[in-house]
Regions:
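Non-catalytic cap/lid and distal C-terminal segments of serine-dependent acyl enzymes
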Residues: 1-150
Length: 150
């Protein structure tokens, strides 16, 4: 395992995609690249949408993970806020984002892509047929591995 930032990366899918970007954006001094597949990247926006809140079968606890969900926007858990801090500090990881057209997080991922493109982020964005499933992730992990080693 390298201690060289340029050879240290993180990747994940679904909530792990959020976790990968969270690690990368929280510690850009350690991680040079962070990749997400089907990531729950805009947690403040997802909380505000009825998609996740109203699902009675959802085992996810916003409060246990992030504290008061009403205070997510702009917090240390908000990837947009972390990105802006990294830009101000002059150290930002390269980002990779992949999502399937049929993924329930597709629209949220489009929003994240659009916001980061406005900020001129070093972002590779991929979308393709597929959903929030292993078939999609298995395809894109190959692409991510190639990207990480560039």
């Amino acid at each position: 395992v390298s201690k060289d930032r340029e050879k240290t990366y993180v990747a994940g899918f679904s909530m792990g995609g959020y976790g990968a970007w969270y690690l990368g954006l929280s510690r850009p001094d350690i991680y040079s690249k962070a990749a997400s597949m089907s990531g729950a990247l805009d947690i403040a926006g997802l909380y505000q949408s009825s998609t996740i809140q109203e699902n009675e079968n959802n085992p996810f606890s916003w409060e246990d993970s992030f504290g008061d969900p009403e205070k997510l926007a702009g917090s240390n858990y908000d990837l947009f806020a972390l990105y802006d801090k990294d830009v101000a500090d002059g150290c930002v990881p390269k980002l990779y984002q992949a999502v399937g057209f049929d993924d329930f997080l597709y629209k949220s991922n489009l929003h994240v892509r659009d916001e980061l493109q406005k900020k001129h982020a070093d972002l590779v964005y991929k979308e393709d047929k597929g959903g929030h499933d292993w078939t999609f992730w298995d395809k894109y992990i190959q692409d991510i591995l190639d990207w990480l080693l560039q």
